[in-house]
Amino acid sequence: MAGMAPEGSQFDAKNYDSKMQELLSQGETEEFFTSYDEVHESFDDMGLQENLLRGIYAYGFEKPSAIQQRGIVPFCKGLDVIQQAQSGTGKTATFCSGILQQLDYGLVECQALVLAPTRELAQQIEKVMRALGDYLGVKVHACVGGTSVREDQRILASGVHVVVGTPGRVFDIVRRQSLRPDNIKMFVLDEADEMLSRGFKDQIYDIFQLLPGKIQVGVFSATMPPEALEITRKFMNKPVRILVKRDELTLEGIKQFYVNVEKEEWKLDTLCDLYETLAITQSVIFVNTRRKVDWLTDKMRGRDHTVSATHGDMDQNTRDIIMREFRSGSSRVLITTDLLARGIDVQQVSLVINYDLPTQPENYQHRIGRSGRFGRKGVAINFVTREDERMLFDIQKFYNVVIEELPANVADLL
């Protein structure tokens, strides 16, 4: 069960929590971090290897995003780093670049371990790592649940430079000694807030206990709740913090609108009207339950709209096929839930529709960060019933943004 310490764990949650609470209550949080403000406005100014630069440009990056301008170099210097930035700003490429710069490619042993909260996100990181490291000959493998342990063991035995995975599977393969931690010199927690909210704290702690004493740690997160700050105290040595303040989390480059739909029953007609009005390359529609994913998919197909759908009740193989079709563009509309929001990284997504507003303001950025990725323009449209008005207000307050009513000329925005 997630959140339970695995068998043989030395983790004492009660003691750990009380110790962390004591540290946090001492008001020393600010002194624990040093900030890093050096800015590099071009990838060429970062001192990166030529073949890494080739991979970065081939992937489609032209100019580093705000987090990349400040975050790649300290990671390349071997510093422990805490980096907070919204989804869609290139956090993944930040730590991938830092790892790829520091690997010893002559040593085909695991030198970097990256943990992510979901299979989809782990597999996405694997793809980015492989693409950026294409000219370096990097060997990377994703170890995730729902796949063959034997296949993991075979690939790891043949030698890899980087392992990306979910906490449960990674702990399992380290415990089985299929992944030898002796040469691991970099440890990254991606979407740390999400991993902690899913109850992975114990497993993260247990994995860390098995790693070499001298190791570089990177914590990357869209939000930084108290539990994430706690874990940084436990694992990190004089970390530098690169923080995008909440008033900067404005999801720059994404135009955000709402549509007043009054009643739940009116949403479907509103959605179909939008699709008839707009020329959409690719879009993601978010709803709040798995059952609603299935319901909306049936309704849209019944009205002759081609849509695909994915949610947590589907087996991994089916989800992979659907995501592959969506990435390739053979399917242009994807209906899904928050569960998979962070694993969707499709460059062409120009529109996100919140058919249901998220139940937590924090999830809003994970959803709409799917559009306008890496500086491309994107549009987010929120369907708002009378019951949703409070949540819309909370979202605007949380991100310090004004979400305006959808204008009549919406077709010109896409």
Curated annotation (Swiss-Prot):
UniProt GO cellular component terms: cytoplasmic stress granule
Alphabetical keyword list: ATP-binding, Helicase, Hydrolase, Initiation factor, Nucleotide-binding, Protein biosynthesis, RNA-binding
Molecular function via GO: ATP binding; ATP hydrolysis activity; RNA binding; RNA helicase activity; translation initiation factor activity
Short motif Q motif, span: 41-69
EC number: 3.6.4.13
Binding site for ATP: A85, Q86, S87, G88, T89, G90, K91, T92
Keyword Hydrolase part of the UniProt annotation: yes
Domain Helicase C-terminal intervals: 253-414
A GO biological process held by the record: cytoplasmic translational initiation
CDD domains: DEADc_EIF4A, SF2_C_DEAD
Motif placement: DEAD box: 190-193
Pfam families: DEAD (PF00270), Helicase_C (PF00271)
InterPro entries, A to Z: DEAD/DEAH_box_helicase_dom, Helicase_ATP-bd, Helicase_C-like, P-loop_NTPase, RNA-helicase_DEAD-box_CS, RNA_helicase_DEAD_Q_motif
Helicase ATP-binding domain boundaries: 72-242
SMART domains: DEXDc (SM00487), HELICc (SM00490)
Substrates-to-products reaction catalysed: ATP + H2O = ADP + phosphate + H(+)
Record's keyword annotation contains ATP-binding: yes
Subunit structure, interactors included: eIF4F is a multi-subunit complex, the composition of which varies with external and internal environmental conditions. It is composed of at least EIF4A, EIF4E and EIF4G.
Family to which this protein belongs: Belongs to the DEAD box helicase family. eIF4A subfamily.
Role this protein plays: ATP-dependent RNA helicase which is a subunit of the eIF4F complex involved in cap recognition and is required for mRNA binding to ribosome. In the current model of translation initiation, eIF4A unwinds RNA secondary structures in the 5'-UTR of mRNAs which is necessary to allow efficient binding of the small ribosomal subunit, and subsequent scanning for the initiator codon.
Protein name in UniProt: Eukaryotic initiation factor 4A
Species of the source: Triticum aestivum (Wheat)
Lineage: Eukaryota, Viridiplantae, Streptophyta, Embryophyta, Tracheophyta
